[in-house]
Amino acid sequence: MSTKKVYSFLSQAFIFSAIMLISNIIATHLPIPMPSSVIGLVILFSLLCLKVIKLEQVESLGTALTGIIGFLFVPSGISVINSFGVMGQYFVQILTVIVVATVILLAVTGLFAQFILGKDEKETEDTKELKVVNKGRKHGKVA
């Protein structure tokens, strides 16, 4: 029987707030423009992977925020609507960038998947060969 510690909303909000504060500081000091939210996600992911923060310390607030994610995108949608004049002026360029970026993303994802699957296949073949060699050694037949 395992007991799971329940963390208060306030402690979870403090963890998220501290990470966002750190990511805002990092974003202002970077030489390239990068959204602080992306930096915050990377920091949170790293802290979870390194087990500095346990999942249960941020899980319920993360789940709640995921539940209202559509509402959180409303300001972005409004700013896109407000920018229709600029978007109409540069429609072809914007569409070209979107299409090219999508094709590049699909190609890189496909190549990476093939690389990983090919590596996995090779490891499977190597494992089979190793088992055959080890079987031969058990029976006194060394090649």
From Swiss-Prot:
Kindly state which keywords UniProt assigns to this record, in alphabetical order.
Answer: Cell membrane, Cytolysis, Membrane, Transmembrane, Transmembrane helix
Q: Does the keyword Cell membrane apply?
A: yes
Keyword Transmembrane appears in the UniProt entry: yes
The membrane-topology field of this record reads: Multi-pass membrane protein
Q: Which domain of life is it from?
A: Bacteria
**Name of the protein this chain belongs to:** Antiholin-like protein LrgA
Q: Chief localization class?
A: membrane
* Regions crossing the membrane: 6-26, 30-50, 61-81, 97-117
- Gene Ontology cellular component annotations, sorted alphabetically: plasma membrane
**Matching Pfam families:** LrgA (PF03788)
Q: What does this protein do?
A: Inhibits the expression or activity of extracellular murein hydrolases by interacting, possibly with LrgB, with the holin-like protein CidA. The LrgAB and CidA proteins may affect the proton motive force of the membrane. May be involved in programmed cell death (PCD), possibly triggering PCD in response to antibiotics and environmental stresses.
Q: What is the lineage of its organism?
A: Bacteria, Bacillati, Bacillota, Bacilli, Bacillales
What family does the Swiss-Prot or TrEMBL record give for this protein? Belongs to the CidA/LrgA family. LrgA subfamily.
Q: Which GO BP annotation is one of this protein's?
A: cytolysis
Localization per record? Cell membrane
